[in-house]
Amino acid sequence: MKVAASVRKICEKCRLIRRRGRLLVICSNPKHKQRQG
């Protein structure tokens, strides 16, 4: 899980979702997981 100031989609399978007021990127590729910190 990468913690980044600005999260963005890396590939077309990446999905931006909002969970508990945080912006997350979930993807089939585990390397693409990101959270806004």
UniProtKB/Swiss-Prot annotation:
GO CC, alphabetical: chloroplast; ribonucleoprotein complex; ribosome
Protein name (Swiss-Prot/TrEMBL): Large ribosomal subunit protein bL36c
Keywords: Chloroplast, Plastid, Ribonucleoprotein, Ribosomal protein
Organism phylogeny: Eukaryota, Viridiplantae, Streptophyta, Embryophyta, Tracheophyta
Similarity field: Belongs to the bacterial ribosomal protein bL36 family.
Cell compartments where the protein resides: Plastid, Chloroplast
PROSITE patterns: RIBOSOMAL_L36
One GO process term, biological-process aspect: translation
Pfam family, any one: Ribosomal_L36
Broad class of the protein's primary localization: plastid
GO MF terms held by the record: structural constituent of ribosome
